[in-house]
Amino acid sequence: RLVMGHTQGKGCYCFVNGLLSAQVGKRAQNYKYIVVDNEAGMEHISRGILPGVDAVILVSDCSRRGIQAVGRIARLIPECGLKPKKVGLIVNRAPGGVINDGVREEIEKQNLELLGVVPQDEGVFDYDSAGTPTTQLPADNPVRQELYHILEGLGL
């Protein structure tokens, strides 16, 4: 397991970034999709470690400050030389699966495309607390259903 955002030495990500670049390069031709899940930020992208990016999916909690942070990251995408076909936002852990007017206003202010709203769910909390993979959530779980809906809408 490769964990981004943790240094191998004082302030240096070189080893981890080199490892990521080599592994993605070796495997890219064998897969239709490669998902890179990382902590907030664009370091490994800005350093040119990934050969190309088709989609950037930004995930935020259901707060105005979270949306503002995602907006700042979205504005960095062109500065990093990326030209993804799709840039979008998923709001996670929304109470009742609904975003309020303030959060919706901030999404519009940040000029973000809303891909979907994932509800806060006790089932996910229970699975996580028990160490059970969330991939085992039942098909009728609202989080699972929303994620399938988002994936279908991406059209990748």
Segments (PLM) and residue ranges:
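Short, flexible micro-motifs
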Residues: 8, 44, 134
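C-terminal alpha-helix
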Residues: 146-156
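Conserved catalytic-core segment of NTP-binding enzymes
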Residues: 14-117, 126
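Generic structural signal for well-ordered, non-membrane alpha-helical segments
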Residues: 13, 100, 140-147
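Acidic phosphotransfer microenvironment of two-component signaling modules
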Residues: 122
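Residues in well-ordered beta-strands of folded domains
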Residues: 3, 90, 135
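C-terminal boundary of histidine-terminating zinc-finger modules
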Residues: 130-141
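Conserved P-loop NTPase mechanochemical-coupling segment
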Residues: 1-10
